[in-house]
Amino acid sequence: MSSFGTLFKVTTYGESHCKSVGCIVEGCPPGMNLTESDVQVQLTRRRPGQSNLTTPRNEKDKVQIQSGTEFGVTLGTPIGMLVLNQDQKPHDYSDMDNYPRPSHADYTYLEKYGVKASSGGGRSSARETIGRVAAGAIAEKYLLEAYGVEIVAFVSSVGKIAIPLHETASSAILDPEDDTFESPITAEYLKFLNKITREEVDKTTVRCPHAATAAKMAERITRARDNHDSIGGTVTCVIRNVPTGLGEPCFDKLEAKLAHAMMSIPATKSFEIGSGREGCKVAGSKHNDLFYRNADTGKLGTLTNNSGGVQGGISNGENVYFTIGFKSPATIGVEQSTSRYDGSDGVLAAKGRHDPCVVPRAIPIVEAMAALVVMDAVMIQQSRIASRNLLPNAQ
């Protein structure tokens, strides 16, 4: 389906080479200041052609708010936004029209719908994510103003190159006779997640906040591009100042909704929250997040955060953080011996303009989907609280 969310609902539309792409946002609270410039910031971070590490497709991606606001204020009615496609080159795909691109969605879309877009990948193109980013910018603005929620994503690895702070401690066994490991999430890493900013992330073209590692990542992406190949990587995201109580057990737990959102992004292959897979190697005595009373807030907090800010599917007030794995882009210029749609053998060397690595441009998409999840969860929880407060003898 092309819609996401329950109370804060987003529907995206458009294909890679159609006239426009965009979205309709339902459920935005009325009375919030909102202009196109509020949305444009994130769309500009997502747009192609920002560096030689991304596709050279030249799109301005200027957003137009079509409805739902008046005099720069939200009305509480559906907000329609569109972005014009202006640099399509369908002829780049003419030679590929006889082939389903290996590991791309060409074949599966044809099998599902009985017809496929002849150029650009149609709905499976990353152009579809423009609507997500636009909607996410609205959600993020509300969350920041109402709750102080901050969302920052960054590239944590490209291929085998990872930032040092993202390396885990699980490679060192504590005792030769003990087969358990230390917690993979160090205090240093948690401090890093607590202070990292988008300005620091955007200082490098790769969007990795560790300069030395970013340079190596850039070299790796450049090598893939020069070889007409591609490479994958990971994006880590932290959500700060998350209210407690978000998430709907049992099937709409907060981490389940985040996983749903992140795995709906094109090219994603994995999702890990908190200590992730590495936490499976740790004994409970080393992995449990012990509670303490926060002197500033008077509330309980945790000394560590292996849970990633979620326990029992509900936010506990700590930072929510997770890592998403993105595969290498499927459309590459390397010659591949594969079959045509008619079953005959051939050699495909893809043409067109494509990202050699998607993770640098995936940053605002990940942030947007995180904002949509938290926004929807906040509205659901607030409706529960409001209903409860109407009871005269609520306990």
UniProtKB/Swiss-Prot annotation:
PROSITE patterns (alphabetical): CHORISMATE_SYNTHASE_1, CHORISMATE_SYNTHASE_2, CHORISMATE_SYNTHASE_3
SUPFAM superfamilies registered for this protein in UniProt: Chorismate synthase, AroC
Pfam families tied to this protein: Chorismate_synt (PF01264)
GO BP terms in the entry: amino acid biosynthetic process; aromatic amino acid family biosynthetic process; chorismate biosynthetic process
Keywords: Amino-acid biosynthesis, Aromatic amino acid biosynthesis, Lyase
Family matches, as PANTHER family: CHORISMATE SYNTHASE
Subunit structure: Homotetramer.
Family: Belongs to the chorismate synthase family.
UniProt-recorded name of the protein: Chorismate synthase
